[in-house]
């Protein structure tokens, strides 16, 4: 049975806010371009621990990604001839599908400024999604032993991260008003028998444009961020 979790008072201490640059591209972004941007910022933070952090909130052009140790058995197509670009990347987790209508958040944060613990960080990313859902009047669910968020046993948010010397990259993907057809090409997150959903299934007419400010606010609150600049 799913465990329903409400809001938790575990946000970063707002008395010590962290400067962060916010990037919100207006058009869907190629995955490799967003990945390169994260890597550059991660390198910057590794070289200068006092540098500001960064967050990307965007939508991707249609693609599939495989985590570090992900199995190709969860692909329902020939990886040599994918229906959309396929990337093997340096995050945890199995296969994920990205496409327009899905909001993706990529925080490049220094966990040593908070809690240097990846399990803590994954739970905080889940809490970001729970906070967004609560603002929409929806009660999200965590499932024991699994990472991500569900509504009525349908997964609406996938989470997978990478980390180098406690500097994070990658993050979360929240299905808002995306097409569901591409998910049939894979076993999302390698979870056989688990359905995938989108927020518009519960709130017809909801758009990514309406949810994006809520996601921005939830990330700032959860990690104690003060936006240094916005690039849209």
Swiss-Prot record:
Q: Which GO terms describe its molecular function?
A: lipoyl(octanoyl) transferase activity
Locate the site labelled Lowers pKa of active site Cys: 155
What general EC class does the enzyme of this chain belong to? Answer: transferase
Where is substrate annotated to bind? 91-98, 158-160, 171-173
Give a yes or no for keyword Cytoplasm in this entry: yes
Q: Could you tell me where this protein is found in the cell? A: Cytoplasm
Q: Name one Pfam family in it.
A: LplA-B_cat
The reaction(s) this protein catalyses: octanoyl-[ACP] + L-lysyl-[protein] = N(6)-octanoyl-L-lysyl-[protein] + holo-[ACP] + H(+)
What keywords is this UniProt entry annotated with?
Acyltransferase, Cytoplasm, Transferase
Q: Which domain of life is it from?
A: Bacteria
Pathways per UniProt: Protein modification; protein lipoylation via endogenous pathway; protein N(6)-(lipoyl)lysine from octanoyl-[acyl-carrier-protein]: step 1/2
Q: Which InterPro entries match?
A: aa-tRNA-synth_II/BPL/LPL, BPL_LPL_catalytic, Octanoyltransferase, Octanoyltransferase_CS
Q: What is its EC number?
A: 2.3.1.181
The biological process GO terms on file are: protein modification process
Task: Kindly state one GO CC term assigned in the UniProt record.
Answer: cytoplasm
Q: Which NCBIfam families match?
A: lipB (TIGR00214)
- What is this protein's function per UniProt? Catalyzes the transfer of endogenously produced octanoic acid from octanoyl-acyl-carrier-protein onto the lipoyl domains of lipoate-dependent enzymes. Lipoyl-ACP can also act as a substrate although octanoyl-ACP is likely to be the physiological substrate.
Relay the record's extra comment: In the reaction, the free carboxyl group of octanoic acid is attached via an amide linkage to the epsilon-amino group of a specific lysine residue of lipoyl domains of lipoate-dependent enzymes.
**Protein name listed in UniProt:** Octanoyltransferase
Species of origin reads: Synechococcus sp. (strain CC9605)
């Amino acid at each position: 049975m799913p465990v329903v979790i409400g809001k938790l008072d575990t946000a970063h201490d707002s008395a010590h806010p962290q400067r962060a640059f916010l990037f919100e591209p207006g058009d869907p972004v190629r995955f490799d371009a967003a990945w390169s941007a994260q890597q550059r910022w991660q390198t910057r933070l590794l070289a200068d621990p006092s540098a500001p952090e960064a967050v990307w909130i965007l939508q991707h052009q249609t693609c599939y990604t495989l985590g570090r140790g992900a199995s190709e058995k969860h692909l329902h197509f020939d990886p040599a001839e994918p229906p959309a670009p396929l990337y093997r990347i340096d995050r945890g987790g199995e296969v994920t599908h990205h496409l327009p209508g899905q909001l993706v958040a990529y925080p490049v944060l220094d966990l040593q400024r908070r809690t240097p613990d990846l399990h803590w960080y994954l739970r905080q990313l889940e809490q970001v999604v729970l906070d967004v859902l609560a603002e929409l009047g929806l009660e999200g669910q965590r499932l024991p032993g699994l990472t991500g968020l569900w509504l009525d046993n349908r997964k609406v948010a996938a989470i997978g991260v990478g980390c180098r010397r406690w500097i994070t990259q990658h993050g979360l993907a929240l299905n808002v008003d995306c097409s569901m057809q591409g998910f049939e090409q894979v076993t999302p997150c390698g979870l056989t028998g688990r359905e995938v959903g989108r927020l518009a299934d519960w709130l017809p007419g909801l758009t990514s444009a309406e949810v994006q400010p809520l996601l921005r606010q939830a990330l700032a609150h959860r990690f104690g961020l003060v936006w240094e600049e916005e690039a849209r």
